[in-house]
């Protein structure tokens, strides 16, 4: 057994142990006074553990480590850190950059404007272009993403946006997030309008683009900061299936979801092919 390090915060020590377990490394926590010592039985994996520990100490609240605790069933860690709403919200607040916050604020503002002055007036200004006469109104190609038609619709999209866009802005930069937002809004709008006309709205096409983008980067760089928990991937796929088979009994912009997902995957694929998969910001 090798003593790797000692941490003064036992909760963080457990989180790191959970994460290393998902990487195929078994570690042991030994209380030592006010400290929690981390011990490793597999000598040959010491370099891997030290590298992972360095990244962990830079950002111990990253959702990757909480996701690892969920996957390994570490109830002790979840209970002490106040998982769920109390555990996630501080991490979400930390990672939201200016663009993430700005889009969130615009979505909320537009929603309240619709309630105050009426849906028709707001939609008339922000809907996808109805034809060539409106093609020059450039904002319409993306402004449909800010329209939400119920509180549940708004909350669903904004929470996912906050989480995924926050990760992307923090680790891939504001420019990457801005490009992905514009591309996915335009492409998902074009595809959805082909199937259902212009009366649609919501951030979900962009959200699905972010899901594809983050997932691809996580697959290509497993040790990097961008990561999609398996539960989120399963949920996204089930939501797509439910929409196509009308299981939920509500109107869902299925074409926009698929178009957004493909856009995000393609942008991540392009970046990783150009050798940008490790170009993370800190």
UniProtKB/Swiss-Prot annotation:
Cellular compartments annotated: Cell inner membrane
Transmembrane segments: 97-117, 145-165, 173-193, 195-215, 224-243, 248-270
Main location: membrane
GO molecular function: serine-type endopeptidase activity
Family, per entry: Belongs to the peptidase S54 family.
Catalytic reaction annotation: Cleaves type-1 transmembrane domains using a catalytic dyad composed of serine and histidine that are contributed by different transmembrane domains
Name of the protein in question: Rhomboid protease GlpG
SUPFAM superfamilies recorded: Rhomboid-like
Upper lineage: Bacteria, Pseudomonadati, Pseudomonadota, Gammaproteobacteria, Enterobacterales
GO biological process: proteolysis
EC number: 3.4.21.105
Organism, scientific name: Sodalis glossinidius (strain morsitans)
Keywords: Cell inner membrane, Cell membrane, Hydrolase, Membrane, Protease, Serine protease, Transmembrane, Transmembrane helix
InterPro entries: GlpG_N_sf, Peptidase_S54_GlpG_N, Peptidase_S54_rhomboid_dom, Rhomboid-like_sf, Rhomboid_protease_GlpG, Rhomboid_protease_S54
Top-level taxon of origin: Bacteria
Gene Ontology CC entries for this record: plasma membrane
């Amino acid at each position: 057994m090798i003593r790797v390090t000692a941490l003064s915060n036992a909760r963080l020590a457990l989180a790191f142990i959970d994460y290393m377990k998902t990487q195929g490394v078994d570690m042991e926590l030994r209380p030592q006074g006010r400290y929690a010592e981390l011990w490793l039985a597999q000598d040959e994996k010491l370099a891997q553990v030290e590298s992972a520990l360095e990244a962990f100490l830079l950002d111990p609240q990253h959702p990757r480590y909480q996701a690892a605790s969920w996957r390994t069933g570490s109830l002790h860690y979840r209970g002490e850190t106040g998982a769920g709403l109390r555990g996630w919200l501080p991490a979400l607040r930390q990672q939201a950059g200016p663009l993430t916050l700005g889009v969130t604020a615009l979505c909320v503002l537009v929603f309240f404007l619709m309630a105050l002055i009426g849906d028709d007036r707001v939609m008339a200004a922000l809907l996808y272009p109805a034809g060539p006469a409106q093609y020059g109104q450039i904002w319409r190609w993306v402004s449909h993403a800010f329209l939400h038609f119920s509180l549940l619709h708004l909350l669903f999209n904004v929470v996912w946006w906050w989480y995924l866009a926050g990760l992307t802005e923090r680790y891939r930069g504001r420019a990457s997030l801005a490009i992905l937002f514009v591309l996915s809004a335009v492409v998902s709008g074009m595809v959805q309008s082909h199937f259902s006309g212009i009366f649609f709205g919501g951030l979900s096409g962009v959200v699905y683009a972010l899901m594809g983008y983050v997932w691809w980067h996580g697959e290509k760089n497993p040790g990097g900061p961008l990561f999609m928990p398996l539960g989120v991937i399963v949920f996204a796929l089930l939501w797509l299936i439910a929409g196509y088979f009308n299981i939920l009994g509500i109107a869902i912009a299925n074409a926009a979801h698929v178009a957004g997902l493909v856009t995000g995957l393609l942008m991540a694929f392009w970046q990783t092919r150009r050798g940008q998969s490790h170009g993370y910001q800190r």
